[in-house]
């Protein structure tokens, strides 16, 4: 797994072409109308759908008011610097409603559940499950075979660029609604209890709980049984 440097991310955002993509349903005398250099138009008779940049399509609509009877615009972002990750070739299970930005690394057989938000530079290891409504901030790094519980937040660090990101090592289980703050490393095989706020590093194979989170015990057989990672959920 490769962790992106903060300055790489800053440069990527700074130099990206900002985009306001739209989908426009249009009706009228459409033959011969140029909707813009970036546009893809699917026209059938006097109706059609156009995909492209709003600045170009808006100009075409204004210049052809006499021909266009009606139109409806679908738009979900404005001057966006970072596109969404292309999911088609990711060897993972990604459920509807997950928001995953470009420049995110997702390992094979990972699971991303509904409502998860994963920011640029994040890394998700093989076989790791990111549960519903989890937030992975910029550069948050999660190892292999982890479970990040529903509603948890792994804080992001892009600025200041010198700051250390959150690192979750392999085989970690984080309970629902836990928060791991910037710069924290959670060691291999550790368990973070539900609702904990983790402000300091967590030793491997320990259990932490509370606000702020503190060690309550070492991992034992009972804890292993309660936090078992089921590979059946990760099969494609």
Curated annotation (Swiss-Prot):
UniProt keyword terms in alphabetical order: Acyltransferase, Amino-acid biosynthesis, Diaminopimelate biosynthesis, Lysine biosynthesis, Repeat, Transferase
Primary enzyme class: transferase
Pfam families in the cross-refs: DapH_N, Hexapep, Hexapep_2
Record-linked PROSITE patterns: HEXAPEP_TRANSFERASES
Biological or metabolic pathway of the protein: Amino-acid biosynthesis; L-lysine biosynthesis via DAP pathway; LL-2,6-diaminopimelate from (S)-tetrahydrodipicolinate (acetylase route): step 1/3
Catalytic activity, as annotated: (S)-2,3,4,5-tetrahydrodipicolinate + acetyl-CoA + H2O = L-2-acetamido-6-oxoheptanedioate + CoA
The keyword Ligase appears for this protein: no
Described purpose of this protein according to its UniProt entry: Catalyzes the transfer of an acetyl group from acetyl-CoA to tetrahydrodipicolinate.
Similarity annotation: Belongs to the transferase hexapeptide repeat family. DapH subfamily.
The protein's name: 2,3,4,5-tetrahydropyridine-2,6-dicarboxylate N-acetyltransferase
